[in-house]
UniProtKB/Swiss-Prot annotation:
Disulfide bonds: none
Pfam families named among the record's database cross-references: PfkB
Gene3D superfamilies the UniProt entry points to: 3.40.1190.20
Similarity comment: Belongs to the carbohydrate kinase PfkB family.
Keywords: ATP-binding, Carbohydrate metabolism, Kinase, Nucleotide-binding, Transferase
Documented EC number(s): 2.7.1.-
The keyword Mitochondrion appears for this protein: no
PROSITE patterns: PFKB_KINASES_2
Function as written in the Swiss-Prot or TrEMBL entry: Catalyzes the phosphorylation of a range of fructosamines to fructosamine 6-phosphates.
Protein name per UniProt: Fructosamine kinase FrlD
Domain of life of the native organism: Bacteria
InterPro entries attached to this UniProt entry: Carboh/pur_kinase_PfkB_CS, PfkB_Carbo_kinase, PfkB_dom, Ribokinase-like
């Protein structure tokens, strides 16, 4: 199974540790798929600063194909993070994606050929690839992480091109998850999965709804657990074509991620000059 993730990357800076960790939804899924034993590639835009150099080195160490990555002059994406007593992530602020916010990926013929050689493409709401989805879904099936974006206009725009739709839904009741799945299916998504933190996950395959409880873990840090769930599900389902099995693998992968800082480790000591603001926003 060959997975390609396209889009966002970031480093998550932990104020209390004065350390940043590689991350970003698309990059996390690429690395975690590789760790699960599958061929993996990543295409995205990085800067030319210390954070970008660390990301590129990590991709090399993890043996994720980064041959088609774009590097531009400017700062890499950085999110400033602290943790609460439960190990949940609280974002303090960010640089809005850094250089990624001022550029966009333009797919050339060689990119299209490279992407076509994979079995599945994963991207996210943070990757700004909505206009490219009609082309991409014609190459390989598309997985899309909507995070908490459930706006009807956005679902109508994206879902027609998506095979696997993932939502962060820890604030939703079970009935609200059902309504969201119904809407996403109505606009074209084939499978719709809502991850709900400690409440586990709900997946709708259209004709059947599946429930997956969490796998108990000693929690150090929950950052990246949702991305790990996605990587675990996609790789397992593409190999076995068994939803129940894939959900269990996803939950186990997410549990392991909760036992390390960052999505998959690789902390890099770094002193942020301004230290960030004190305003905090909890990410569900």
């Amino acid at each position: 199974m060959k997975l390609i993730a396209v889009g966002d990357n970031v480093v998550d800076y932990y104020q209390d540790q004065e350390t940043f960790y590689p991350g970003g939804n698309a990059l996390n899924v690429a690395v975690l798929a590789k760790r699960l034993g599958h061929e993996s590639s990543y295409i995205g835009i990085v800067g030319n600063d210390e954070a970008a150099a660390h990301l590129l080195n990590v991709l090399k160490l993890e043996q994720v194909n980064a041959d088609y990555i774009r590097q531009a002059h400017g700062e890499n994406g950085m999110a400033i993070v602290t943790l609460d007593e439960q190990g949940d992530r609280i974002f303090v602020r960010s640089n809005k994606g850094g250089i990624q916010s001022r550029l966009r990926l333009a797919f050339q013929e060689k990119d299209v050929s490279f992407i076509s050689g994979h079995d599945l493409l994963h991207t996210s709401v943070y990757s700004r690839l909505e206009n490219d989805l009609p082309q991409l879904c014609g190459l390989v099936p598309v997985s899309f992480d909507f995070s908490t974006n459930r706006e009807d206009d956005y679902l109508r725009r994206v879902c027609p091109y998506v095979t696997y739709a993932f939502f962060s839904g820890s604030d939703l009741s079970e009935s609200e998850c059902g309504e969201l799945a119904k809407t996403a299916h109505g606009y074209g998504a084939k499978m719709v999965c809502m991850t709900r933190g400690g409440q586990g996950a709900i997946l709708s395959a259209g004709d059947r709804v599946y429930h997956q409880p969490i796998v108990e873990a000693d929690i150090i840090d929950t950052l990246g657990a949702g991305d790990s769930f996605i990587a675990g599900f996609l790789t397992a389902f593409c190999v076995k074509q068994d939803i129940t099995y894939a959900l269990r693998q996803a939950a186990e992968t997410a549990a392991k991620t909760c036992g390390v800082y960052g999505a998959f480790g690789y902390g890099y000591p770094y002193r942020l000059e301004d230290g960030g603001s004190s305003e905090k926003t909890r990410i569900l």
